[in-house]
């Protein structure tokens, strides 16, 4: 299973809304688009059109990860996921694992601490240790669902990423730029600014001197 960025967002939204707003689930295309474009609890924030969401939905339907549902007497088609925990799904996840996968689909790589803080509407973890235990279970499967990313400079915890989407495989495993390199780059930039300003001031002073000389010559010719 490999999801595009848009497909991962659609699945993540359906998983989330099934738990947090069950009275509104399944979702219409309009509701699903609004969920995909939320400004909060989404990373990155997207601005998908209904057409783009429909394309993702149609693709997921072909992959048998979404099903359509029409209410009696209503023409509005609504969508529900078949990603996990349904009679048609091979994938069965515990509530804790579902919460972690959902958050990673919606918000990208996160630390165990971030997952615990952000999961309260999906699942209540007692502590970070419980989150870490669940992460290990998801990583130790025959086909892992998560992987650990190299720890970034300045972070106490490593981040984890889901392995269902194509975007996760594009993440660089290399460490980010070293702090010394960053500081050096900033120092060069700061040094460059005064040099540019000094050059500009010198040019202006030269122009003023030339104008003053011409003015003096003009006054002399008139006297």
UniProtKB/Swiss-Prot annotation:
Gene3D superfamilies: Winged helix-like DNA-binding domain superfamily/Winged helix DNA-binding domain (1.10.10.10). SUPFAM superfamilies: Winged helix' DNA-binding domain. Pfam families: DUF480 (PF04337). Belongs to the UPF0502 family. PANTHER family: UPF0502 PROTEIN YCEH (PTHR38768:SF1). This is UPF0502 protein Sbal223_2520.
